[in-house]
């Protein structure tokens, strides 16, 4: 498979948004091209094994699902983030780690957990 036929898709979530992410994944998978490979990466800090297993059930022949714990990558930002966590939840900041996690891709697609693909 060539690199152009791989589509990396990133989501960030915590335990509270797993049901919404499930809907998003279901709608994405319903609209995938069978000749493309979709690499789904779920950014999290402490997603339970149960939640991860629920999301793994969306795996298909052309859809792989991986979990990336981002807390290690965000440690350098912790002091700056602490003051802003009152305004946004922590998964909002997981996007800061994307440049560190996506170096082997020219392009990625980042989607919020409540995205519905039509």
PLM regions: where:
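Residues at the C-termini of beta-strands that transition into short coil/loop
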Residues: 13, 44, 69-71
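Residues at the starts of beta-strands that form the adenosine-phosphate
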Residues: 37-39, 64, 107
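Short internal beta-strands
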Residues: 38-46
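An acidic- and aromatic-residue-enriched active-site/binding cleft used to recognize and process polar
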Residues: 14-16, 45-46, 113-115
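N-proximal low-complexity "stem/linker" segments adjacent to membrane-targeting elements
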Residues: 1-26, 30
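Active-site-proximal specificity loops/subdomain of glycosyltransferases
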Residues: 50-52, 56-100
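Short, surface-exposed alpha-helical segments at coil->helix boundaries
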Residues: 22-25, 49-53
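GT-A fold catalytic core of metal-dependent nucleotide-sugar glycosyltransferases
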Residues: 91-118
